[in-house]
Amino acid sequence: VEWTDQERATISSIFGSLDYDDIGPKALSRCLIVYPWTQRHFGSFGNLYNAEAIIGNQKVAAHGIKVLHGLDRAVKNMDNIKEIYAELSILHSEKLHVDPDNFKLLADCLTIVVAAKMGSGFNPGTQATFQKFLAVVVSALGKQYH
């Protein structure tokens, strides 16, 4: 994947402005609520019976934060995203058996949460760059499935 200087700056700026403790839990909670079949991978997280329970679940919040810190690795290594996610791809495919389509669903939920947070700053150009970045991450995480 080729990245322009503008795209690199946009991704760095977006992630530099995000409060991971806020955005991470919101994105994962949204994914679990909007796509309830994704909950099957989080059985050890306890009560996920309804939206209120999911939003208030500390394990969901902690994992959402962990996901954003994982994305931070990609931000800092934009030229080697597939390589830095190789082990994580193996973990999710071989041990956890996560449906690779779920990565795209979570990426879509993250896009919505970031757009809501950024407001008018999340213009079409910014969105295009953000979604390009997430598409590369999703592809890297799904690499072991192919």
UniProtKB/Swiss-Prot annotation:
Residues 2-146 form the Globin domain. Red blood cells. GO terms for molecular function: haptoglobin binding; heme binding; metal ion binding; organic acid binding; oxygen binding; oxygen carrier activity; peroxidase activity. Gene3D superfamilies: Globins. Heme b binds at residues 63, 92. GO terms for cellular component: blood microparticle; haptoglobin-hemoglobin complex; hemoglobin complex. It holds the Pfam family Globin. GO terms for biological process: hydrogen peroxide catabolic process. The keyword Transport applies. InterPro entries: Globin, Globin-like_sf, Globin/Proto, Hemoglobin_b, Hemoglobin_oxygen_transport. It comes from the Eukaryota. Keywords: Heme, Iron, Metal-binding, Oxygen transport, Transport. Involved in oxygen transport from gills to the various peripheral tissues. Belongs to the globin family. Hb1 is a heterotetramer of two alpha-1 chains and two beta-1 chains. Hb2 is a heterotetramer of two alpha-2 chains and two beta-1 chains. HbC is a heterotetramer of two alpha-1 chains and two beta-2 chains. This fish has three hemoglobins: Hb1, Hb2 and HbC accounting for about 70%, 5% and 25% of the total, respectively. Hb1 has high oxygen affinity and displays strong Bohr, Root and phosphate effects. This is Hemoglobin subunit beta-1. It comes from Eleginops maclovinus (Patagonian blennie). The lineage of its organism: Eukaryota, Metazoa, Chordata, Craniata, Vertebrata.
